[in-house]
């Protein structure tokens, strides 16, 4: 085993999505190998995070949450960058940046050159879930122009990493198509699922018994309430299938839900409207309301008789219970970068119906005539009619072949997607990083110079007081032993009066011509 390292993971918002699940699993896996691990994040709500965070199994430090996530519902990427820069600035100020041997950064790469510059010897591994610029909406010319510098920044700053890894071969192919000026060959580190079964909380057993009758069979969808997840596909396929009209079946739709996120609220309403237009009996339960005072919670009248049940932000314990007993997981996103939920289902022997593109091509073994010993589900085109047929095919197949998926699923997941397998992949890539010399990429210098210029120009809003911002910046750089940059800022402090006169003279000269 390698010498224990002090490892920092930097992640923007430690919620309950797939990216956050990977961060938590990576942290636990590395910690179990004897490394000291700290997760730095700009936001972590203890009521909206994974159980390992709630229990305090991992050290989590929140920095920069005082900054807004958006400005009037816009400028999300700008605010995300500012929050991450505030986080790194705090690490520089308090000296924590020099305590870490390795930084694992994901989602947002803006801080990578800064980590290289201000850390005495730390290496940086960037985990690319998917190019951020492909996730951004560009509905107008203004939004397209607004994204241009951030797209370039993503590419340049990611290129400053010591190593880049991606979550699937699908993402790897997209990486090559997107980042054309980078000469990187990222390796694949698959996300994982914990093979150990989570203990099911008593309150969740009680919750389950309240919504599922003893003779009910249910189909399950688990995703965030976002339009790109195409949860409507599961809903429309279920109501078009024969199974959907059976008296003992229902559809459970669970989703990560945050009332602060407008799309979560809007999309849940859209799904409810689909049910109402089709005269499908449905009910919505916000799990957080139940979990606050479970002994006093009153379930909606006739909840067991509802055909569709929407559950918002359920606990990991309830999720485990639902996955274990589901008839079939309906995994609806198209071109999903990886998709962890199918693995969580297959771990319990629950078959999966997923779209035949993106990550599921690597995680779900579709049933064919010659692979009954390895099949874990079905891959089908994202069409409600085709999915309805697959749902009915599954029902017939499981009746004739009970136990097939209960054997195949867990074995497939354990062999390729366990936490041990993922940790081993991470350690292999970390070994490779430390086998080579630490190199500051030219991109890093360019980014730092650009940032210095922006800071210099921005500080002018403070008038003559900006001189002392220069002096403060220079002092911080001296403390961090970055003497050349410190000299630059001290010179600005000394020469500020002359620079101001020069700028005023040039402005006065050009003004009549303009």
From Swiss-Prot:
Membrane topology (UniProt): Multi-pass membrane protein
The protein's role, per its UniProt record: Mannosylates Man(2)GlcNAc(2)-dolichol diphosphate and Man(1)GlcNAc(2)-dolichol diphosphate to form Man(3)GlcNAc(2)-dolichol diphosphate.
InterPro entries: ALG2, Glyco_trans_1, Glyco_trans_4-like_N
GO function terms (MF aspect): alpha-1,3-mannosyltransferase activity; GDP-Man:Man1GlcNAc2-PP-Dol alpha-1,3-mannosyltransferase activity; GDP-Man:Man2GlcNAc2-PP-dolichol alpha-1,6-mannosyltransferase activity
Family in the record: Belongs to the glycosyltransferase group 1 family.
Alphabetical GO biological process terms: dolichol-linked oligosaccharide biosynthetic process
Signal sequence bounds: none
List of glycosylated residues: 94
Principal location class: endoplasmic reticulum
Catalytic activity: a beta-D-Man-(1->4)-beta-D-GlcNAc-(1->4)-alpha-D-GlcNAc-diphospho-di-trans,poly-cis-dolichol + GDP-alpha-D-mannose = an alpha-D-Man-(1->3)-beta-D-Man-(1->4)-beta-D-GlcNAc-(1->4)-alpha-D-GlcNAc-diphospho-di-trans,poly-cis-dolichol + GDP + H(+); an alpha-D-Man-(1->3)-beta-D-Man-(1->4)-beta-D-GlcNAc-(1->4)-alpha-D-GlcNAc-diphospho-di-trans,poly-cis-dolichol + GDP-alpha-D-mannose = an alpha-D-Man-(1->3)-[alpha-D-Man-(1->6)]-beta-D-Man-(1->4)-beta-D-GlcNAc-(1->4)-alpha-D-GlcNAc-diphospho-di-trans,poly-cis-dolichol + GDP + H(+)
Enzyme class at the top of the EC tree: transferase
Record-annotated membrane-spanning stretches: 443-463, 468-490
GO CC, alphabetical: endomembrane system; endoplasmic reticulum membrane
Record carries keyword Disulfide bond: no
One Pfam family recorded for the sequence: Glycos_transf_1
Encoding gene, per UniProt annotation: ALG2
Name of the protein this chain belongs to: Alpha-1,3/1,6-mannosyltransferase ALG2
